Amino acid sequence: MRCLLLALIFISLWALFSELRAESSTACPVTTQVESTAIARAWHDDVINRRNPTKLSDIVGPEVVHHAAGGYPKIMNAEGIAAMMGDFLAAFPDLLITFDQFIAKDDFVVERYTASGTHQGPLGDLQPTNRTATWTGINIFRVACGRIVEVWSEVDAEGRRRQLILPLTTPGR
């Protein structure tokens, strides 16, 4: 009787374990730090540098939240992010992002970058100045299931604006 009881307990535990394994295999795969960094890099490299805005839908999750700085709404979804990137590409058609540093830890990737471009289209209330500006920024991405699900952005918008609106100075004057 004792053996039968132990066998039933074993079979029950085995069935439960098998069920849990099946559930975990249908959950999203774990994203490695290397994969997360590549996904974060695509945010600027594919969408901005390669002028491929459709790539955004491949790298952000359906419920992505972007905590933005620099004059945009504080929280944006995928449509808001696409509109923001479109605004920047219209304002700076030659916009180029260079990557200064990536740091990955767990499901977070920090990107430090430098951007530069010639201001040829409206940007918020600022009309085109045809001046070139260079500014820096930092993004913190949270990546889950191979997609960006949350972003915190800080950008030197004030430094960019100063470069675009202040009178040009000539050295020695």
Please tell me what each predicted stretch does.
Residues L6-A15:
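Bacterial N-terminal signal peptides
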